[in-house]
Amino acid sequence: MRFRNPVAIAFLLAWLPVNPGLAASAVVKDGSTIQLGNVTYRLDGIDAPAVDQPCIDEHADPWACGVEARDQLTKLIGGKPIHCDDIGIDPTAKKRRLGVCKIEGDPTSLSQVLVRQGYALNVEASATGRFKPDEAAAKNDRLGLWKGCFVAPSEFRSSKKDGALLGNSCPADRDTQIRAALFPDDLAMPASCNIKGKYAVRARVTGNVGIYHLQACRSYPGLTNPDRWFCSEEDAQAAGFRRAYNCRPGAKSK
């Protein structure tokens, strides 16, 4: 069978995944997520702060570590072509894939480099996880996140406020103050990430953890203390949030 409709062919090509055997330019979405063509990959074996996650630096000052983690990955890639070995659907976000991604010509994965630089955590449960030595070295050298105080990215995303404090600058006698800084009531909005997210029990009816609000939603102005900020609807959906029902039909994030 031969396709003669150029519009149909273009539509099909737009939804085909990038050939895993080819290298392509990457768009960095956060410290452990990149997009190649129309395919979004979470880097396998690691986790990094979401763009809106705050940390505390070595001087006990608030630190936008999620933004820095994203920028560090952008700097690491440096516009060079990226090759990803696709290893399947991301179990935490069905529209995304897991990938072992490398700069073309470099045998070391982006995952390993980010863990060694201290901007991502090893998440493999095994004590002999691939990146355990890299994480131990980063912690010992006070690199990246480890120079300050932070919570595991997964615990920030789930709002687990009583989780373990990580890093080399977490004095035990300041526990309450540190947690207040890591889970602030007034979470700062990262630049160009103006989608508001709010955890909501009613969202569980649809299998979600919260609701996101675009600027075109009637609820947007009245939501003054969002729990999360997202840069795109895809990011919000990957985090388990659904769109508010009071958004205008056809509304899009700006």
Annotated model-derived regions:
Residues 69-73, 106, 110-111, 115, ...:
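Stable alpha-helical elements in mature extracytoplasmic
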Residues 22-119:
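Electropositive
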Residues 54-65, 124-143:
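Short, surface-exposed secondary-structure junctions/capping segments
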Residues 8-18:
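Bacterial N-terminal signal peptides
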Residues 41-47, 82, 108, 129-145, ...:
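N-terminal leader and targeting sequences that precede the mature domain
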Residues 43, 114, 138, 212-213:
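Bulky hydrophobic/aromatic "packing anchor" residues in well-ordered structure
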Residues 121-129, 144-254:
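Mature, structured domains enriched in cysteine- and short glycine motifs
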Residues 1-8:
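Bacterial N-terminal signal peptides that target proteins for export
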